Each structure stands twice: as structure tokens, then as C-alpha cells.
């Protein structure tokens, strides 16, 4: 039963893929270890017309079925990034519950996937992908099946009383705002060239959205492309903020206050050689000066603490390596996944493959005794 439910969810996930590609993947999954390994190799070498998210998902499914399939760095990096915000205690707790589940039916009692946060779900997926031999086949299949069920539920026609067209329109608006944000980041940080490149990509995506908005064929592909841009824009924004903290700190410390300057500042209100116009008396001026100095000192201390935290994260916790990897995948990808996905979306639009039927809103049938019905 577990294997059949996984196949059904995989087929539902691939509903927007070209029919021959979908058939080839399903045939590989049902054809045994040798067929699955061959298909995983084709996916890894990008010989199948799949978008980046589809490719990594299918590789995760195949490795969960057959641990002999070697992990793919692209899929591992995606999982690491998705779980980077998860607390260590939460990760330990999730792993303990997974091992205690025992069998396929036991996954339901500890999962309740719809109540889980995305990073908790991805922690489970990462566990069965990175350490498949630590879990029984039923636990691996149950985890991946539930993950696919969540992804398929999120792609239903209506969700939270907002139509798919309405959600896409909101996302297009976010793309335009991202383009403006990248323009601002290019002007204030040292990430100018990369920010401008990402801005051009967001503008191109916005133009493509305007031309294809309302197309049932293009809607899921546009949403995936927009989601990819959102992640890259978010990473660029975080890098820009870290860059600004360093710049502001060194701008302030480049001109430290001397004792003489401090004395001059404190006695500024007693200066009778210059004509000044103000509405403060002597005591008020003295207090305002002290308050300004106090705020300046607090700001300096805050920035210094931020610098120390970043140094600790880099040298002690080893997070700089992961951050550098994020920078590489964000601004220097080996293959621009977004452009590749957009090109594939255009190809699918031209071929007119697998257009959803507006009159058919019935869900894809699944077994009534499936354990993940909540």
C-alpha cells in the first residue's frame, strides 16, 4: 500500500510535466532499482525536461526508494538551506520521533504534516535523504509521501478563499516590488553588479507574467519561477544588511572622538564667539548633548556586538562556509535555474501540453484507507 500511495502522489506532483516525461519517471519508479538508478542519473545530468524544483524532488523520491542511489549535491544543498533556521533541539526531537514510529502506519501519529512548519517537514525529508539506512523503507516512503501530499495540497485550485489567479496576481506585485528593492540595494552596497543582474531578471519575469497571466498552462510554472526569485531576493537582502552593518561600523570608528573633542562637545552651549539661535536653556543643552552621546555609545556597542556575533558564527560555529555557499548559489550559480525554468515554461506553453480543464475540479483520486487523511 505504501508504494502505491507514493506513486499516486508522485503522479499528482508531475501533473504539469510533459506526458512522456511523467510516464518515463513513473515507469522508472515502478520498474525496480536499475530503472530508478538510470532515471536518477538522467535527472542529475539534466537530460530530462524538468524544472529545478521538480528535478530535486524526483531525485529525493528515488533515493528514498533505493538508498543505493548516491545523493545529489543540489538536492542536499536545497534541504540544508530549507532547515537552516531549525533549532538543534527540534531536529533531535523530530529524529527521535521518526525512529520511534516503527512502521509506515506509525508515521501518521507523529507527523500531522499540515500542522508542521515547513522547516520541520524538510528536516524529516532531509533525514531520510541524507541517512536512508537509518530508517526502515516504510518510514522513508511514509515521510516522502506525506511531503508530496503537502505540496500537492498547496497547489489546489482554491486555498484560503483566494483563487489561483488572485494568488498569482499578488505574487506578480511582489516581483515588481523585488525589482525596486534590488535597484535600491545596488545603489547602497557593494553588491551592485549582482543586485542589478537580479533586478533585470525580476523585470523580465514581471514582463513574462504580464503576457501569460490568466493562462492555465503557465500559472503553475510562473508560481515556481516567482518562488525561486523570492528566495534569491531574500538572500540578497540579508547579505545587504550584513554588508551595511560592517560599513556603518567602520564609518563611525574611522573618526573616533578624542578627549578634546568630547570636552568641546560638552561645552558647546557656552560658546560666545559664534552667533547661535536656539530655544534651549543651558541645562537643556547640556542634557541633550549627554543624551546624544549616550545614544551614540549605545549604537557603537550594538554594532560592535553584531560584528562579534558574526565573527563567532564564522570562526567558532563555521557558518561562514554555508553563507559563502548561499552567496555562490545566489549570485554565481553554475546554471541560472530561473532562466532555465522560464525557458522550459515557454516551451511547455508553445507545445500546449497537459492543459488543465477548467470544468474539472475533481481531486485526483487516492486510496480511501490512506493513512495521511487528516
Swiss-Prot record:
Known role: Ion channel, which might have a role in genome packaging and uncoating processes.
Alphabetically ordered keywords of this record: Disulfide bond, Glycoprotein, Host cell membrane, Host endoplasmic reticulum, Host membrane, Ion channel, Ion transport, Lipoprotein, Membrane, Palmitate, Phosphoprotein, Signal-anchor, Transmembrane, Transmembrane helix, Transport, Viral ion channel, Viral matrix protein, Virion
Quaternary assembly: Homodimer; disulfide-linked. Homotetramer; disulfide-linked.
Modified positions (Phosphoserine) in chain numbering: 337, 362
Lipidation (S-palmitoyl cysteine): 324
Extracellular compartment spans: 260-288
Originating species: Influenza C virus (strain C/California/1978)
Name the record gives this protein: Polyprotein p42
Site residues (Cleavage), renumbered to this chain: 259-260
Record PTM: Palmitoylated. N-glycosylated.
Family assignment from sequence similarity: Belongs to the influenza C protein M1 family.
Transmembrane segments: 239-259, 289-309
A single GO cellular-component term on record: host cell plasma membrane
Pfam entry (one): CM2
Amino acid at each position: 500500500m505504501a508504494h502505491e500511495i507514493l506513486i499516486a502522489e508522485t503522479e499528482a506532483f508531475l501533473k504539469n510535466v510533459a506526458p512522456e516525461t511523467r510516464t518515463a519517471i513513473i515507469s522508472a519508479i515502478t520498474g525496480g532499482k536499475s530503472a530508478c538508478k538510470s532515471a536518477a542519473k538522467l535527472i542529475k545530468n539534466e537530460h530530462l525536461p524538468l524544472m529545478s524544483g521538480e528535478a530535486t524532488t524526483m531525485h529525493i523520491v528515488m533515493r528514498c526508494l533505493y538508498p543505493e542511489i548516491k545523493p545529489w549535491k543540489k538536492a542536499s544543498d536545497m534541504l540544508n538551506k530549507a532547515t537552516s533556521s531549525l533549532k538543534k533541539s527540534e531536529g533531535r526531537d523530530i529524529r527521535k520521533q521518526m525512529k520511534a514510529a516503527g512502521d509506515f502506519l506509525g508515521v501518521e501519529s507523529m507527523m500531522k504534516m499540515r500542522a508542521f512548519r515547513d522547516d520541520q517537514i524538510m528536516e524529516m525529508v532531509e533525514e531520510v535523504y541524507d541517512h536512508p539506512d537509518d530508517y526502515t523503507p516504510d518510514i522513508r516512503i511514509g515521510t516522502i509521501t506525506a511531503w508530496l501530499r503537502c505540496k500537492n495540497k498547496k497547489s489546489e485550485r482554491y486555498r484560503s478563499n483566494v483563487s489561483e489567479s488572485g494568488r498569482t496576481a499578488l505574487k506578480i506585485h511582489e516581483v515588481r516590488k523585488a525589482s525596486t528593492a534590488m535597484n535600491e540595494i545596488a545603489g547602497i552596497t557593494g553588491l551592485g553588479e549582482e543586485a542589478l543582474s537580479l533586478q533585470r531578471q525580476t523585470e523580465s519575469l514581471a514582463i513574462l507574467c504580464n503576457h501569460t497571466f490568466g493562462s492555465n498552462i503557465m500559472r503553475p510554472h510562473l508560481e515556481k519561477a516567482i518562488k525561486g526569485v523570492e528566495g534569491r531576493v531574500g538572500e540578497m537582502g540579508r547579505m545587504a544588511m550584513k554588508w551595511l552593518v560592517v560599513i556603518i561600523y567602520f564609518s563611525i570608528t574611522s573618526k573616533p572622538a578624542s578627549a578634546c573633542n568630547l570636552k568641546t562637545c560638552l561645552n558647546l552651549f557656552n560658546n560666545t564667539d559664534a552667533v547661535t539661535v536656539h530655544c534651549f536653556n543651558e541645562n537643556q543643552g547640556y542634557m541633550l548633548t549627554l543624551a546624544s552621546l549616550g545614544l551614540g555609545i549605545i549604537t557603537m556597542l550594538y554594532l560592535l556586538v553584531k560584528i562579534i556575533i558574526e565573527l563567532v558564527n564564522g570562526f567558532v560555529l563555521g557558518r561562514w562556509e554555508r553563507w559563502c555557499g548561499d552567496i555562490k548559489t545566489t549570485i554565481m550559480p553554475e546554471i541560472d535555474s530561473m532562466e532555465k525554468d522560464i525557458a522550459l515554461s515557454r516551451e511547455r506553453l508553445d507545445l500546449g501540453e497537459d492543459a488543465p480543464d477548467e470544468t474539472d475540479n475533481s481531486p485526483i483520486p487516492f486510496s480511501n484507507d490512506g493513512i495521511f487523511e487528516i
